[in-house]
């Protein structure tokens, strides 16, 4: 298998993104934002009912600090969307590998 280029900056970015995405709750948030629509915390809270608004806000803060999501304020509401196009590519690739690819479905236990 080919080795990835040994570029400190790119490895650092990849590590930061994967670390932030590696949490199942944050991964779920990103999947909800992957359609390109902005969503407020309250909208995300309705969709992801297993997280309190406080926990959801903390996870969104972590994603924002990692430059994975961006915010837009409209009056008192803050809307979130995916900032980094690479994150969308990663999400699509994972969907293809683990959901769309019939060969992968056969090999999973």
What does each model-identified segment do?
Residues 1-13, 35, 84-109:
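Amphipathic alpha-helical dimerization/coiled-coil segments
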Residues 7-8, 48, 64:
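Generic alpha-helix initiation/capping and coil-helix boundary signal
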Residues 26, 58-59:
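Histidine-centered divalent metal-coordination motifs
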Residues 55:
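Residues in the helix-turn-helix
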Residues 12-52, 74-86:
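N-terminal helix-turn-helix DNA-binding core of bacterial DNA-binding proteins
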